[in-house]
């Protein structure tokens, strides 16, 4: 790998409602990424847990701060033990803040953390666009029942890979967000996700390649995959749920990938593998600059008409 190339790892996993088990998988994937000489590893949305319903999510979110602290400690341990630095981008949940509760808002926060090799959280981006949809011949989902939307566009991160713009899952459907991140200097965009089978099959690759071409950025797409076990006997007992009320399974699309600024897929998860998986790609900043120089979209934009 030459000096102009930076290696990225994109992880795919199948989260459950058990944060302890999920953390074990996350740590194993980070360890593998270090051993394969990645500079940054990107994990999917909801790497801490997936839940049965809004009440279950609020219950599990109380455990997320401990998950995050243990993850930070694990990163520093892995860096020390392997004598190699790595940064980590990971989608997790946070419980409502004290101010949220004072305002009568008990919904959780869906956030993307960027943690450096010293275990420091450099950025906490809260998902802007929430997945409230009635998919034709598919599920009816209303993320806003359990999640509060963010209120701010995240700053660009000066990562070992280059200038990184952060987004989460459904954000990818709003091109103005990606274009804004590009206008702020982004060279790389990440979209950690938990796409449904129906929407993933129809739009996952299409959206990723479109955002890469729109922005002339590398696009990183770590996804949840497979059938998730959302059973939680402890919570079900506490909440006195009947068997009919339980919703202990959901399925995610997977197909994690890395796309270059020309819209070419340069790394793709093995679709036959449902378990945890890591894909690698070497990002070439000279290629990015060449594409931007030969097709100077940002110089040709009609900012006098479009704002």
From Swiss-Prot:
Record has Oxidoreductase as a keyword: no
Documented EC number(s): 3.5.1.128
Main location: cytoplasm
UniProt-listed GO biological process terms: amide catabolic process
Binding-site residues, substrate: 173, 199
Reactions performed catalytically: N-(4-oxoglutaryl)-L-cysteinylglycine + H2O = L-cysteinylglycine + 2-oxoglutarate; N-(4-carboxy-4-oxobutanoyl)-L-ethylglycylglycine + H2O = N-(2-aminobutanoyl)glycine + 2-oxoglutarate
GO cellular component, one term: mitochondrion
Record key words, sorted: Cytoplasm, Hydrolase, Mitochondrion
Pfam family, one: CN_hydrolase
Effect caused by changing residue 169 to S: Abolishes enzyme activity
CDD domains: nit (cd07572)
Active site: 45 (proton acceptor), 127 (proton donor), 169 (nucleophile)
Compartments where located: Cytoplasm; Mitochondrion
GO MF annotation, one: [acetyl-CoA carboxylase]-phosphatase activity
Role summary: Catalyzes the hydrolysis of the amide bond in N-(4-oxoglutarate)-L-cysteinylglycine (deaminated glutathione), a metabolite repair reaction to dispose of the harmful deaminated glutathione. Possesses amidase activity toward deaminated ophthalmate in vitro.
PANTHER family: DEAMINATED GLUTATHIONE AMIDASE, NITRILASE-RELATED
Record note on quaternary structure: Homodimer.
Protein name, entry field: Deaminated glutathione amidase
Source organism (scientific name): Saccharomyces cerevisiae (strain ATCC 204508 / S288c) (Baker's yeast)
Encoding gene per record: NIT2
């Amino acid at each position: 790998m030459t000096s102009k190339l930076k290696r990225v790892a994109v992880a795919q996993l199948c989260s459950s409602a058990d944060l302890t088990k999920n953390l074990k998988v996350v740590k194993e994937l980070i360890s593998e990424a270090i051993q394969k000489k990645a500079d940054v590893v990107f994990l999917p949305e909801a790497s801490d847990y997936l839940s049965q319903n809004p009440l279950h999510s609020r219950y599990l979110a109380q455990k997320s701060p401990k998950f995050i602290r243990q993850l930070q400690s694990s990163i520093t341990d892995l860096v020390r033990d392997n004598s190699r630095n790595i940064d980590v981008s990971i989608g997790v949940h946070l419980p409502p803040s004290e101010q949220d509760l004072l305002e009568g808002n008990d919904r959780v926060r869906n956030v993307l953390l960027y943690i450096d090799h010293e275990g420091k959280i450099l950025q906490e981006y809260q998902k802007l666009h929430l997945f409230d949809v009635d998919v034709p011949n598919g599920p009816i989902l209303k993320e806003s029942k359990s999640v509060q939307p963010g209120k701010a566009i995240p700053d660009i991160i000066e990562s070992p890979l280059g200038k990184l713009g952060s987004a989460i899952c459904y954000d990818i459907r709003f091109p103005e967000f990606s274009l804004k991140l590009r206008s702020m200097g982004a060279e790389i965009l990440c979209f950690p996700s938990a796409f449904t089978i129906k929407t993933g099959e129809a739009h996952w690759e299409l959206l990723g390649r479109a955002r890469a071409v729109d922005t002339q950025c590398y696009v990183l797409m770590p996804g949840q995959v497979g059938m998730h076990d959302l059973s939680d006997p402890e919570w079900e007992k506490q909440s006195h749920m009947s068997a009919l009320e339980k919703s202990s399974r959901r399925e995610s699309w997977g197909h994690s990938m890395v796309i270059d600024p020309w819209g070419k897929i340069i790394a793709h998860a093995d679709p036959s593998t449902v378990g945890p998986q890591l894909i690698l790609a070497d990002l070439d900043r000279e290629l990015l600059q060449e594409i931007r120089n030969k097709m100077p979209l940002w110089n040709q934009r009609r900012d006098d008409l479009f704002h």
